[in-house]
């Protein structure tokens, strides 16, 4: 499909620079192509007073989520934890003077090796030495130095650090910064609040460069409400990479290549999710990262298997979903792979109309913005 078919106009003022407080007070746009199956507005505490009759859309709050789920449904969360993966340093070559460079780590490929996006990418060569954390910041744990081992396309490099394992992790934590999405970083600098705001309350597996942002809306109070409603919670891990921020430069979706991200679905979690399906429950993914991982781990039959590896799954309209029934996700960029994914999930025309509604009624977009709850069009 042509990439420009996924374009839309988004006013700058719709981009959220801070999250809602409390987190579960964010707005929730429910998008149900099968409108007759959604709850009546009067049964949902925070339904906004707008006639929905036969509409596929209804306006709510994230705290209303239990009203749209049934006992026995299962929420699938991505428990990856964002690391301070934005590094600043000085490049050295053949004993010559240094040049300022930045690198955003995006996928670990060994105890001492990371793939990263480096700037200025054109001036970096294989064999270059980069000393990170030496310009105005001291690394208390020793030099965070690396060699450029490989150079790929679009500024991607493989860095071989002198440190390894936990020592490398501690050094990165000491000098790195939270890599805010470009659309936020362009409007304000990262600050201490972001270290908490840009992390889910259940994050535990370190390795992500970007937060699984749909999960940012969850609070202990919302978890308690979901427990009372008999909704199961399960966790998988997909370490979100910096590739999620990269624009689609191709003119056709067939020519776009996704960057790989590493993830794991344990055999135990797979078995529990299969049991949910067998009992008639629904698999509800919290975030596109959870969905992409579950779909990567699913057989054509819909059975989910234990899985570990790197996925580059690219979901566009025409994709046949194998396991996921519902999706909770934030509002995405025009022409992005994630808007393509939601268009595949709930329908191309439906999602264009949903985003038009969201923009006209003041929903907040992107990582710190509001959320949507999507029903699958072919269910």
From Swiss-Prot:
Which biological pathway?
A: tRNA modification; tRNA-queuosine biosynthesis
Designated name of the protein: S-adenosylmethionine:tRNA ribosyltransferase-isomerase
Q: Tell me where it resides.
A: Cytoplasm
Q: Give the similarity note.
A: Belongs to the QueA family.
Q: What reactions does this protein catalyze?
A: 7-aminomethyl-7-carbaguanosine(34) in tRNA + S-adenosyl-L-methionine = epoxyqueuosine(34) in tRNA + adenine + L-methionine + 2 H(+)
Q: Which residues form a coiled coil?
A: none
Task: Tell me a GO cellular component.
Answer: cytoplasm
Do the record's keywords include Nucleotide-binding? no
Q: What's its job?
A: Transfers and isomerizes the ribose moiety from AdoMet to the 7-aminomethyl group of 7-deazaguanine (preQ1-tRNA) to give epoxyqueuosine (oQ-tRNA).
Protein's organism: Rhizobium leguminosarum bv. trifolii (strain WSM2304)
Tagged with keyword Ribosomal protein: no
Its BP terms in the Gene Ontology are:
queuosine biosynthetic process; tRNA wobble guanine modification
Subunit description: Monomer.
Provide the E.C. number(s) assigned to this enzyme.
2.4.99.17
What Gene Ontology molecular function terms does this protein carry? S-adenosylmethionine:tRNA ribosyltransferase-isomerase activity
Instruction: Outline the segment boundaries, as ranges, of region: Disordered.
Output: 35-58
PANTHER family the record matches: S-ADENOSYLMETHIONINE:TRNA RIBOSYLTRANSFERASE-ISOMERASE (PTHR30307:SF0)
Q: Which UniProt keywords apply?
A: Cytoplasm, Queuosine biosynthesis, S-adenosyl-L-methionine, Transferase
